[in-house]
Amino acid sequence: MKSGRFIGVMSGTSLDGVDVVLATIDEHRVAQLASLSWPIPVSLKQAVLDICQGQQLTLSQFGQLDTQLGRLFADAVNALLKEQNLQARDIVAIGCHGQTVWHEPTGVAPHTLQIGDNNQIVARTGITVVGDFRRRDIALGGQGAPLVPAFHHALLAHPTERRMVLNIGGIANLSLLIPGQPVGGYDTGPGNMLMDAWIWRQAGKPYDKDAEWARAGKVILPLLQNMLSDPYFSQPAPKSTGREYFNYGWLERHLRHFPGVDPRDVQATLAELTAVTISEQVLLSGGCERLMVCGGGSRNPLLMARLAALLPGTEVTTTDAVGISGDDMEALAFAWLAWRTLAGLPGNLPSVTGASQETVLGAIFPANL
């Protein structure tokens, strides 16, 4: 069973940067050693946003984007190696999630697509890469997501305390760690995605820092109720979603009925949408004693306050409080999933994704034969 230093690379639906984490991993523990966040050029970010919202590309443009993202991920890894004075030979493997550009796990031909050429990463770092983690689960009838609940269970489950882990990235997803029950997990709906899209269009800001805009506005209750009527929110688990569904076009369709509203009121309403949809799912799942929050949304003071208010009797905290950086959680999870793949261990949980069986995930791109 391979153990040693692994690197995890994650670029999520928020597109707020490439998260890179260095960790020592074996069958007994995961110890984070270092991390960095690598910027995504505005041109690349816009290209990804365009394809996620259905804009057509030529095959040449798509191929170029795949290559450019692969090179970006490699640059991020090499920056971390340089910072830590490490060589390629010091790393067992890289677990790279890739950039999701489409996720459609239901229908006649279910599929998910993450790009960022792993061959580019191998060629530019000299390190074996494990990637393409989601499609095996979909091939076995699963949603292909979320995959992180297995990692949450390995690190954060408690023998007696009812716990849930909430990741608020572009999409919010919940891991149910309930003693005596199979691990559960699913996407609750939009996390930061709609809030970020709105303030980007209205004020040219990548996100609402410290929820300043949202706190200056008032929740528009009719708009909130209109958005809450979306069928995704009442759909039973297993379920997963992404930017191809909850995007700026989705928001525009709901705003057509509310012309002339104050942009800050819309921002406040979107924050409330995220808080309400999460809290409703926590309660529908039986509630918990402790809700541990990670991802960019854990730094949104309004979201954290609203979750605490909507979940009385639940301790709402961040994963940082239990020693795991909320910013690095997902990248760390994919380093761990790479370790499991190389060890021949399953990485999915059928109780979460709905797959017909457990399976080893991903494809291996070896640096050396």
Swiss-Prot record:
GO biological-process terms attached to the record: 1,6-anhydro-N-acetyl-beta-muramic acid catabolic process; amino sugar metabolic process; peptidoglycan turnover
Keywords, sorted A to Z: ATP-binding, Carbohydrate metabolism, Kinase, Nucleotide-binding, Transferase
Catalytic activity: 1,6-anhydro-N-acetyl-beta-muramate + ATP + H2O = N-acetyl-D-muramate 6-phosphate + ADP + H(+)
The EC number(s) this enzyme carries: 2.7.1.170
InterPro entries on file: Anhydro_N_Ac-Mur_kinase, ATPase_NBD
Residues noted as binding ATP in the record, renumbered to the chain: 12-19
Coiled coil feature spans: none
Domain of life: Bacteria
Listed pathway(s): Amino-sugar metabolism; 1,6-anhydro-N-acetylmuramate degradation; Cell wall biogenesis; peptidoglycan recycling
GO molecular function: ATP binding; kinase activity; phosphotransferase activity, alcohol group as acceptor
Pfam families: AnmK
CDD domains attached to this UniProt entry: ASKHA_NBD_ANMK
Purpose: Catalyzes the specific phosphorylation of 1,6-anhydro-N-acetylmuramic acid (anhMurNAc) with the simultaneous cleavage of the 1,6-anhydro ring, generating MurNAc-6-P. Is required for the utilization of anhMurNAc either imported from the medium or derived from its own cell wall murein, and thus plays a role in cell wall recycling.
Family, as annotated: Belongs to the anhydro-N-acetylmuramic acid kinase family.
NCBIfam families cross-referenced by the UniProt entry: PRK09585.1-1, PRK09585.1-3, PRK09585.3-2
Protein name per the record: Anhydro-N-acetylmuramic acid kinase
Gene label: anmK
